[in-house]
């Protein structure tokens, strides 16, 4: 469609040129030459301006480089203000205050030398990207903000982040299929398939409490959960949060959740939560009150105004009976998963899991061994496999036979306390 129109235009121009006299064509040529000359002069002037601007930019970058020399003075943003000077304010030309005439954002900051400073000119950082509480690097002399610094966290909190993912798998856990399913539904699915919950209009649980006797696989389950998800994993221990100084434990909890927000999605695993989550009581001892303050900070982080649904909490304890009711209520640790002693079938599966890398004789009957290990937990069954291997090593055997496992059961049974009642 476009080709005939171009042909029509060119034929029209040819007809127009044919009808023009020689003088008209000469005049039109001169006009075009003048236009070309003017355009060339404009292009030359623009190139010169461009070169001068490049030179100025280079000079300014050199000045910025000189001003940005380390070390910086560290400061905190206290407040961000909007400056709107009145348009009708008239001042004498000799006494114009340029700072008062500026429009835009100004900053009040507090430096590490305990000085509070008002900055009408922010510096080299975009003012819209700043917010109160940000850590910034400022020039030692002019106090202009030169760079934003990463958030400050307690070094103990940074050490809680698990850098190397655990190698455990759900296949390493025997006899806890129901518990695995409940944990995956509450923690893993909301992170990997969030849209399924949104379709149903269901809010997933914020936290999970794993409880049961020692040695039943609570920590192992949390490690397997960390290995199966791509989320950041923070591991806290309850006794770690009990600190000597007042407010130190609460600050650790606050910093841990703040770090989790920055690295979201994130799973926070609190082992032995009964160290800080016991029922509240009247006490004259300041240490008890400090533990209660730490627990109150944990409650606030779980469902306070600043709670984040991308952060999931897994807590583990073997004393669920002494935990504070406020910690156990729905909306905080919504789902409670019990880890009982393994059944006979589960014991056989656990023995097979722990002996799968061992050179075991084909005649070993794991079902019979499971019947002989009544009231054994997962950790004790692992100890049985270790003892059986040590006995085979002692007699210079190349395979672990059924008698070695029986002897291992007897040895673990002898070391085990007569009563398995861990609660007073």
From Swiss-Prot:
ATP binds at residues 212-219. The modification O-acetylthreonine is found at residue 278. Pfam families: AAA, AAA_lid_3, Prot_ATP_ID_OB_C. There is a cross-link at residues 235, 279, 416 (Glycyl lysine isopeptide (Lys-Gly) (interchain with G-Cter in ubiquitin)). Ubiquitous. GO terms for molecular function: ATP binding; ATP hydrolysis activity. InterPro entries: 26S_Proteasome_ATPase, AAA+_ATPase, AAA_lid_3, ATPase_AAA_core, ATPase_AAA_CS, NA-bd_OB-fold, P-loop_NTPase, Prot_ATP_ID_OB_2nd. Residues 1-21 are annotated as: Disordered. PROSITE patterns: AAA. It is found in: Cytoplasm; Nucleus. The keyword Nucleotide-binding applies. The modification N-acetylalanine is found at residue 2. SMART domains: AAA (SM00382). This is 26S proteasome regulatory subunit 6A homolog A. It comes from Arabidopsis thaliana.
């Amino acid at each position: 469609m476009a080709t005939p129109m171009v042909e029509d235009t060119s034929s029209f121009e040819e007809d127009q040129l044919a009808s023009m006299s020689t003088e008209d064509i000469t005049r039109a040529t001169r006009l075009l030459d003048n236009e070309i000359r003017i355009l060339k002069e404009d292009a030359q002037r623009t190139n010169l301006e461009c070169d001068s601007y490049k030179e100025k930019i280079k000079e300014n970058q050199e000045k910025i480089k000189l001003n940005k020399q380390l070390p910086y003075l560290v400061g905190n943003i206290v407040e961000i203000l909007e400056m709107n000077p009145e348009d009708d304010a008239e001042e004498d030309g000799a006494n114009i205050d340029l700072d008062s005439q500026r429009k835009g954002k100004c900053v009040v900051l507090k430096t590490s030398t305990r000085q509070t400073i008002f900055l009408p000119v922010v510096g080299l950082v975009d003012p819209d990207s700043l917010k109160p509480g940000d850590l910034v690097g400022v020039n030692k002399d002019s106090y202009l903000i030169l760079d934003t610094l990463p958030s400050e966290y307690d070094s103990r909190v940074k050490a809680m982040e698990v850098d190397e993912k655990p190698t455990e798998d759900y296949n390493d856990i025997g006899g806890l299929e129901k518990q695995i399913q409940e944990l995956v539904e509450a923690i893993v699915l909301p992170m990997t398939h969030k849209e399924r919950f949104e379709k149903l209009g269901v809010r997933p649980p914020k936290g999970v409490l794993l409880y049961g006797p020692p040695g039943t696989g609570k920590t192992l389950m949390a490690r397997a959960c960390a290995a199966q998800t791509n989320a950041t994993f923070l591991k806290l221990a309850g006794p770690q949060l009990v600190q000597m100084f007042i407010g130190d434990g609460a600050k650790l909890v606050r910093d841990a959740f703040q770090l989790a927000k920055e690295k979201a999605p994130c799973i926070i695993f609190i082992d032995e939560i009964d160290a800080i989550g016991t029922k509240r009581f009247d006490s004259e001892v300041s240490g008890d009150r400090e533990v209660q303050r730490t627990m109150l900070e944990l409650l606030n982080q779980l469902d306070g105004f600043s709670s984040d649904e991308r952060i999931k909490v897994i807590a583990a304890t073997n004393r669920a009976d002494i935990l504070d009711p406020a910690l156990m209520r729905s909306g905080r640790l919504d789902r409670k998963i019990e880890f009982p002693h393994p059944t006979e079938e589960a014991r056989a599966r656990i023995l097979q899991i722990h002996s799968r890398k061992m050179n075991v004789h084909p005649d070993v009957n794991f079902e019979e061994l499971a019947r002989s290990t009544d009231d054994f937990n997962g950790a004790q069954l692992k100890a049985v496999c270790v003892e059986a291997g040590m006995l085979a090593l002692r007699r210079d055997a190349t395979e672990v036979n059924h008698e070695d496992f029986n002897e291992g059961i007897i040895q673990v049974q002898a070391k085990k306390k007569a009563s398995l009642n861990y609660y007073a």
